[in-house]
From Swiss-Prot:
Root EC class: transferase
Interaction with substrate tRNA (site feature) positions: 108, 130
Protein name per UniProt: tRNA dimethylallyltransferase
Gene: miaA
Pfam families: IPPT
Length: 308
């Protein structure tokens, strides 16, 4: 339902638009920014990377030229970019907008949380420790790594799914680098740049069946428009396979295809399935984690006038 009359007559400090992948967030954000002289600000953890415009469905150059877009493709794939990096970049950007309306859009819940609730600063991990954990993980199931973590940091292990390889390895790195459990660094978060501000929070919740169809169709369109070539260039860089850019939806399967382990159709099917599963997790996470301050909107019936 539309906002009440008092709320609708008051311009917010920022608009936040979230939703599952392929729900139409980017197009809506561009329309809102164009209508109100705003700036679209990426809030998606994969669209920050310069290496994967097509595979992450970043706005194309024409779209970016029509209305200002920021924090898209500004990070090299070799960087392990985090919610903390994003929050600092967003704070610096907000200071330059000169009164223009910021429209944050994306699907990464932790980035939205960092904007309002802040983030905990984790210590740097030496490359030698990263290499030690990576070597220890080679050929071992994630559940075994989780058991290793439980011996060193039972509280940290209890917070993580035994199948969440990236976060389990990160917690192991922190413990080995500092001798402290990862939770000990969570007590004093850095404030978020939008904390206490007047915000419009919109979550796009499309029909599930229609969303699955859009995800599958979009993945094939990405391939037709050059996503496989993007992944080939990324593969040639020989980056650490645990980096976020190497784990983007579609990348592992397409690399397996380039290595001869999968047919292209098999790689596409894997990418589609991974993306559908991710969309389901996004819906679940926002429903349980972000509270009632967010308006859930069917994108099929949403208009710019309804949302501001």
């Amino acid at each position: 339902m539309p906002p009440d009359r008092e709320e609708a007559g008051r311009r917010p400090a920022a608009i936040l638009i979230a939703g599952p992948t392929a729900s139409g967030k980017s197009a809506l954000a561009a329309r809102l920014a164009e209508r109100h002289g705003g700036v679209v600000i990426n809030t998606d953890s994969m669209q920050v990377y310069a290496d994967l415009r097509r595979l992450t469905a970043r706005p194309d150059p024409d779209e970016e030229a029509r209305v200002p877009h920021r924090l898209y493709g500004h990070v090299d794939g070799a960087v392990n970019y985090s919610a903390g990096h994003f929050s600092r970049d967003a704070a610096a950007l907000l200071a330059t907008l000169g009164g223009r309306l910021p429209v944050f859009v994306g699907g990464t819940g932790l980035y939205f949380r960092a904007l309002e609730q802040g983030f905990s600063e984790l210590p740097p991990v030496p490359d030698t420790v990263r290499a030690r954990v990576r070597d220890a993980a080679e050929g071992r199931p994630t559940e075994a790594l989780h058991a290793d973590l439980a011996r060193h940091d039972p509280e940290g292990a209890a917070r993580l799914r035994p199948s969440d390889r990236m976060r389990v390895m990160r917690a192991l790195e922190i413990f080995l680098a500092t001798g402290r459990p990862i939770a000990s660094f969570y007590g004093d978060p850095v404030p978020g740049p939008l904390a206490g501000r007047d915000l419009r929070r919109i979550f796009l919740a499309p029909d599930r069946a229609a969303l699955r169809e859009r995800i599958d169709a979009r993945f094939r369109t990405m391939i037709a428009e050059g996503a496989l070539d993007e992944v080939a260039r990324l593969r040639a860089r020989r980056l650490d396979p645990m980096l976020p850019v190497m784990r983007a939806h579609g990348v592992p399967g397409l690399i397996a295809h380039l290595d001869g382990a999968l047919s292209l159709d098999e790689a596409i099917a894997r990418g589609q399935a991974d993306t559908r599963a991710y969309a389901k997790r996004q819906l679940t996470w926002f429903r349980h984690q972000m509270g009632e301050a967010w308006r859930w909107v069917d994108p099929e019936g949403a208009t710019v006038e309804d949302l501001l």
